[in-house]
């Protein structure tokens, strides 16, 4: 089931701190970032039926993958890709970017 962007954002905000594209330097871990990646048109013989936007959703954390469980439960009814992880170093701390991609119905539909 696809959800609207407003529903996506409301659910994400229930999980903790959420930022679009970049977090402020003062943000405390863990936090979520969502970033627009692309738009698709779902078409039929009568024209465009639905416009769907894709977002990358990232959890930046000093913790472990178990921190993904609340997201998985909150979005259980919405298809999203398997999470991937990229370790990194930030201010001499090991930080992990756990990310997925999710599609939502574009605003105004």
Predicted feature residues:
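Short, surface-exposed linear patches
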Residues: 40-42, 54-58, 78-82
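A short beta-turn/loop motif at secondary-structure boundaries
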Residues: 24-27, 49, 89-94
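Oligomerization/assembly interface segments of phage tail-like spikes and tubes
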Residues: 49-63, 94-106
């Amino acid at each position: 089931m696809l959800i609207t962007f407003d529903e996506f954002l409301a659910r994400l905000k229930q999980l903790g701190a959420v930022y679009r594209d970049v977090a402020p330097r003062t943000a405390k871990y863990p936090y979520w970032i969502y970033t627009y990646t692309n738009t698709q048109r779902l078409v039929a013989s009568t024209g465009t039926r639905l416009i769907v936007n894709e977002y990358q959703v990232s959890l930046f954390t000093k913790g472990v993958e178990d921190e993904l469980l609340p997201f998985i439960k909150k979005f259980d009814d919405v298809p999203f890709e398997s999470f991937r992880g990229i370790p990194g170093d930030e201010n001499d701390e090991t930080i992990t970017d756990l990310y997925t991609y999710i599609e939502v119905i574009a605003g105004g539909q």
